[in-house]
UniProtKB/Swiss-Prot annotation:
Site (Activates thiol group during catalysis) residue list: H181
Active site: C154
Database matches in InterPro entries: GlycerAld/Erythrose_P_DH (IPR020831), GlycerAld_3-P_DH_AS (IPR020830), GlycerAld_3-P_DH_cat (IPR020829), GlycerAld_3-P_DH_NAD(P)-bd (IPR020828), Glyceraldehyde-3-P_DH_1 (IPR006424), NAD(P)-bd_dom_sf (IPR036291)
Record-listed E.C. numbers: 1.2.1.12
Family stated for the protein in its record: Belongs to the glyceraldehyde-3-phosphate dehydrogenase family.
Cited NCBIfam families: GAPDH-I (TIGR01534)
Protein's cellular compartments: Cytoplasm
Amino acids binding D-glyceraldehyde 3-phosphate: S153, C154, T155, T184, T213, G214, R236
Gene field: GAPC2
Name listed for the protein in its UniProt record: Glyceraldehyde-3-phosphate dehydrogenase 2, cytosolic
Amino acid sequence: MAKIKIGINGFGRIGRLVARVALQSDDVELVAVNDPFITTDYMTYMFKYDTVHGQWKHHEVKVKDSKTLLFGEKEVTVFGCRNPEEIPWGETGAEFVVESTGVFTDKDKAAAHLKGGAKKVVISAPSKDAPMFVVGVNEKEYKPDIDIVSNASCTTNCLAPLAKVINDRFGIVEGLMTTVHAITATQKTVDGPSSKDWRGGRAASFNIIPSSTGAAKAVGKVLPALNGKLTGMAFRVPTVDVSVVDLTVRLEKPASYDQIKAAIKEESEGKLKGILGYVEEDLVSTDFQGDNRSSIFDAKAGIALNDNFVKLVSWYDNEWGYSSRVVDLIRHMYNTQ
C-alpha cells in the first residue's frame, strides 16, 4: 500500500508532535521538514527530548548530514527556507504539507507551498479564510478540489464533537464556553511586553490569565446550525499541557443529566469512537496527557441546574490530541481524492 507522503513547515510544538504521530503511523511517511531557524543537530535534540511527552523511544534519530535526518533507516530531507514559495516539496514527493509555523494561516500565504510542488496544505491553526474541518464533525464536507484547509484549533476540536452530539440529540438554544487552557509558546516566562493583549504579557507560570478565544465562534463555521449560538473565553493556567472545556448550554428539548450522559456515551462508542471519549472515573488533567482523542467527556464533573440548563466538562490534550487529528485529516483528504 502506498504511503501518504507529508512535509512539515515549522518544527515547533505542533510540528514536532505531528512528526511523532506520522512516524508511528503505518500509512503515513514523513519525507521533509522545513525550518529556517533550527539546524539538523538541534532538530534531532528537540525531537528526541520532550518535557511533556517524554523521550522518543521508537527508533534512533540522528543527523546524516546538514540536509538529512535519519529516523531509524528512514531519511527525512531538511530545508531551511524562510519563504514558503522556495521550499522544493516536489523534490521529496511531499503531497501534503502541514503548515505549523503559526505565521502562514490565511489561504494566500499558505498557497505558497503549492508553488514548491505540494498538492495540499493543512494549516494547524484556525484560518480566517481557509475552510475549517474538524474530524468527526464536518470532514465529510471536504471536496477533492479544495487544496488548502485548516484543522481549526485544539479547543474547537474538543468543543465541536461535544456540541454536535448535544445539538443533534437535544438542540442547543444558546451556550457559553470556557476553556481552562494550559500554557502555550506565545506566553511569557516573566512579565513582558504584549501590546495587543496586556494580560497575556504577564508571567505564565505564576498567574491565571483571562484571555480571548475564537474557538466557540469557530464551532459555528464547522456546525452552521450553531452559528451565532455559542461564544466563550479562556483562562490560561500554569500547567504545561492538557486543557478542559466547560460548555454551559440551554437545551431545546428537556433532558435529565443522566439522559445527556447516556447520549454522549453512546456516541463515544459509535460514530465518534476515537474522537470523543467518556470517563466516569475521578481523573485530573495529567491523566489525559498523551490521550489522542479530541475530547474526553467527564461525566462526574458536569452538573445540571434543571432539565433545560446544563454544564458539561470535557478534557483534551491540546498538543497530542490535536496533532493526531492533523494526521487524521490528511488521511481523510487522501482517501477522498
